[in-house]
């Protein structure tokens, strides 16, 4: 198949999943065309079967804000027409689904087929999409898509609850390359980060308010108060970082906390972790804890959103009530001080990630879904030209 993929190319879960999906599809013989305003950050180089088409937005004095959605639509039409795309898969509803639906409709006027699959990732539904400025457009774009997927059952239900959706939403979870994400021998790195015998707690996020990184620091403070020698490694960057840095100083634990900034890949850091801690207020899936689990790291996470789908049944960690610092600290201390429990959880984490979320099994689900959507579209529009 010749597949177009549009995503936000910046640091974030939806962009990571879209890029990794494209790369995996390319290795399976499909021709992949990324359409975005810059090269996706995990697409370090364009390789065989992978092409990149940059969306340029011209600035005119008349426009206070550059009309990116329209420029994206035009680029989608251009790529679909001249690269003979079989399908366009957009990640994150705003504005990608809207642009894709418009591009499809433009091509239909020329008797050309371009089935559109929209994947919902989280804040495009739970936060941004419910803003009154966007809600009607998001609702229309989802209903007008030829196929819709969500990354968790939680997000699927949230979409039905928040919008007037008339189409079926298929759940295809996020995935990782479990050969790539595995525990590495990094004792030299560990010795450079912490003293012998110290425990290593890791948190990875974009430091936005919803991630509650300040709660991570407060939980870690409780861990230290229990006499546990430990280091906290904070990976990522974002608007709350300066506030979190100040909190570590206010609590007097700044020397036990390392801010590592954006790191890609993160498996070297996860390979020295004893525990992964996530205190988010909302997570549609939980890609960061999945990466930790694949590296054999027990997890302690908020009992919110799609996280229970990932953690429950895995025997790889604990879920805690949102905002309950004491409960989080108790769970973390239990994992860090019980060696046999830690070893069992680490083993279960790796096994569960490989069994349920490996690239090969999930990408196969997307391939099957693409074929279904292409076939259905062709049957519904027999006079439309299907690319050969």
Predicted regions and their residues:
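N-terminal strand-loop element at the rim of the active site
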Residues: 7-11, 23-68, 169
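A short helix/loop element that forms part of the nucleotide-sugar donor recognition site in Leloir-type
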Residues: 182-195, 341
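A short, well-ordered alpha-helix in the C-terminal region of glycosyltransferases
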Residues: 327, 334, 341-356, 362-368
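Aromatic "clamp/platform" in nucleotide-sugar-dependent glycosyltransferases that forms part
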Residues: 262, 281
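Conserved acidic donor-binding segment of nucleotide-sugar-dependent glycosyltransferases
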Residues: 313-314, 318-325, 334-339
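Short hydrophobic beta-strand element within catalytic cores of glycosyltransferases
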Residues: 298-301, 311
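Conserved donor-binding/catalytic core segment of Leloir-type glycosyltransferases
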Residues: 195-211, 217-220
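Carbohydrate-associated surface elements
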Residues: 154, 175
């Amino acid at each position: 198949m010749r597949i177009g993929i549009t995503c936000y190319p910046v640091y974030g879960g939806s962009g990571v999943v879209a890029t990794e999906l494209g790369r995996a599809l390319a290795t399976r013989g499909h021709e992949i065309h990324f359409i975005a305003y810059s090269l996706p950050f995990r697409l370090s180089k364009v390789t065989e079967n992978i092409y990149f088409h940059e969306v340029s937005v011209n600035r005119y004095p008349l426009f206070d804000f550059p009309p990116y959605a329209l420029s994206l639509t035009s680029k989608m039409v251009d790529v679909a027409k001249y690269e003979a795309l079989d399908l366009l898969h957009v990640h994150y509803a705003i504005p990608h689904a809207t642009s894709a639906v418009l591009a499809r409709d433009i091509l239909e006027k020329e008797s050309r087929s371009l089935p559109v699959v929209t994947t919902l990732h989280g804040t495009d539904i739970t936060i941004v999409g419910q803003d009154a400025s966007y809600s009607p457009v998001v609702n229309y774009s989802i209903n007008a898509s030829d196929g819709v997927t969500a990354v968790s059952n939680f997000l699927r239900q949230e979409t039905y609850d928040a919008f007037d959706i008339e189409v079926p939403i298929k759940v295809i979870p996020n995935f990782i390359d479990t050969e790539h994400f595995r525990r590495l021998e990094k004792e030299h790195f560990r010795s450079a980060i912490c003293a012998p015998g110290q425990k290593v707690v890791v948190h990875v996020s974009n430091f936005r308010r919803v991630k509650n990184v300040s709660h991570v620091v407060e939980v870690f403070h409780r861990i230290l108060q229990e006499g546990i020698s430990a280091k906290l490694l904070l990976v990522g960057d974002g608007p709350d970082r300066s506030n979190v840095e100040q909190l570590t100083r206010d609590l007097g634990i700044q020397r036990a906390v390392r801010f590592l900034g954006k790191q890609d890949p993160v498996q070297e850091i996860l390979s020295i972790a004893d525990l992964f801690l996530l205190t988010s207020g909302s997570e549609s899936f939980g890609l960061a804890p999945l990466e930790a689990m694949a590296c054999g790291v027990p997890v302690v996470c908020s009992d919110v959103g799609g996280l229970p789908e990932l953690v429950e049944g895995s025997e790889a960690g604990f879920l805690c009530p949102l905002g309950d610092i004491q409960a989080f600290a108790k769970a973390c201390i239990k994992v860090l001080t019980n060696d046999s429990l830690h070893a069992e959880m680490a083993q279960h984490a790796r096994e569960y990630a490989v069994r349920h979320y490996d690239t090969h099994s999930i990408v196969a689900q997307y391939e099957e879904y693409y074929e279904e959507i292409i076939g259905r579209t062709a049957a519904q529009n027999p006079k439309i030209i299907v690319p050969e």
